[in-house]
Amino acid sequence: MQDALAVILAGGMGSRLSPLTDDRAKPAVPFGGKYRIIDFTLTNCLNSGLRKILVLTQYKSHSLQKHLRDGWSIFNPELGEYITAVPPQMRKGGAWYEGTADAIYHNLWLLSRNDAKYVVVLSGDHIYRMDYAAMLEEHKEKGAKLTVACMDVPVKDASAFGVMGIAENGLVKSFVEKPENPPTLPDDNAKSLASMGIYIFDMDVLKEALTEDAKLETSSHDFGNDIIPKLIDTESVYAYKFCGSKGRVDKDCYWRDVGTIDSFYEANMDLLEPVPPMNLYQSNWAIRTYEPQFPPARTVSSATGNEGIFINSIIATGVINSGGSVQHSIISSNVRIQDSATVVDSIIFDDVEVGEGSQLVNCIVDKHVRIPPNTQIGINKVEDAKRFKISEKGIVVIPESYQF
């Protein structure tokens, strides 16, 4: 992958994920007990052999930039390897990026300094495993100018995606961004072919397309709305079907957009399945992250003799359960569960204390929260709604550093 440059779009506001994104960018939101959302895209790059990576930041990027510094300063600049966070440079005016294509257009000066022949455009806020090297190989074999990764989705969900129509050889014939009435697959009226927001461009094609698009006042400067539909008419654009054993990744069809509280919660809970739909345990595709140096998790008996219990849960380092009960939950590092406290079907971020006798059910608790003894959350939604955000499916979210 020496001839390819990765550009990760990591500047979105993530407003639907509020309050988890009130003080951090969406790609920096903790996930799965020890990771950040962007770790999955970065790991895919690392394991695919991509060693030149630009991360385009924008919205409340401090937490994201700190994570990149602490956990991803692993490449060797002397060998031309790097992961570089790029905040808006304001080289073409004072406004923030207007769309996905506009974000890269404003940084064409960086692309021009690179001798890569191909650009891999990625999003920093999806959960999945994918070998981009296999996609690039197919891009080269077909002589494509643009390759779009895609997957089958139920037609009822397709309006949230760019939907494609393709020929038998994979040539893209049509592309409609978030259509009200999505076209279906020729052989399956219950499914549509959806773009995953993963693109491989020939460098010269991308530069020209972005430059021409920037001249159009009527453009939304977005890949799905503007760039891809136009390239279909002038260049060879191919689809790359995601799913199955491609490259070095074990068979894995898992891809999730965690853009809402409910989808974020469900993706975390997927990790607790007896056989998780996404394999985090493939030894040669380990998900890398920054790991704080805490001692191993432990359970201890409380003063009343209660034993700390973990059942079907993910527990990070530094956790101490002193006579509490944790069931079907994800507990991040340096959390304290006190005597007779119960945590069920919940996600607890770093540095949280669950007070003695407290009950948490169907909750997400952000960092640095001290839950007082005998507090009930997720039991009475009417009372919870007076203090906290509750998702459409009833997940209660306690914001970072909330004071009871």
From Swiss-Prot:
Signal peptide: none
Alphabetized Gene3D superfamilies for the sequence: Hexapeptide repeat proteins, Spore Coat Polysaccharide Biosynthesis Protein SpsA, Chain A
One Gene Ontology term of the molecular function aspect: glucose-1-phosphate adenylyltransferase activity
Catalytic activity annotation: alpha-D-glucose 1-phosphate + ATP + H(+) = ADP-alpha-D-glucose + diphosphate
Pathway the protein takes part in: Glycan biosynthesis; glycogen biosynthesis
CDD domains to which the protein is assigned, alphabetical: ADP_Glucose_PP, LbH_G1P_AT_C
EC top class, as a word: transferase
EC number: 2.7.7.27
GO terms, biological process: glycogen biosynthetic process
SUPFAM superfamilies: Nucleotide-diphospho-sugar transferases, Trimeric LpxA-like enzymes
Binding site for alpha-D-glucose 1-phosphate: Y97, G162, E177, K178, S195
Keywords: ATP-binding, Carbohydrate metabolism, Glycogen biosynthesis, Glycogen metabolism, Nucleotide-binding, Nucleotidyltransferase, Transferase
One Pfam family this sequence matches: Hexapep_GlmU
Record's keyword annotation contains Nucleotidyltransferase: yes
NCBIfam families given in the database record: glgC, PRK00725.1, PRK00844.1
Assigned protein family: Belongs to the bacterial/plant glucose-1-phosphate adenylyltransferase family.
Description of how the protein assembles with itself and partners: Homotetramer.
HAMAP family xref list: GlgC
Known function: Involved in the biosynthesis of ADP-glucose, a building block required for the elongation reactions to produce glycogen. Catalyzes the reaction between ATP and alpha-D-glucose 1-phosphate (G1P) to produce pyrophosphate and ADP-Glc.
Protein name (database record): Glucose-1-phosphate adenylyltransferase 2
Native source organism of the sequence: Vibrio parahaemolyticus serotype O3:K6 (strain RIMD 2210633)
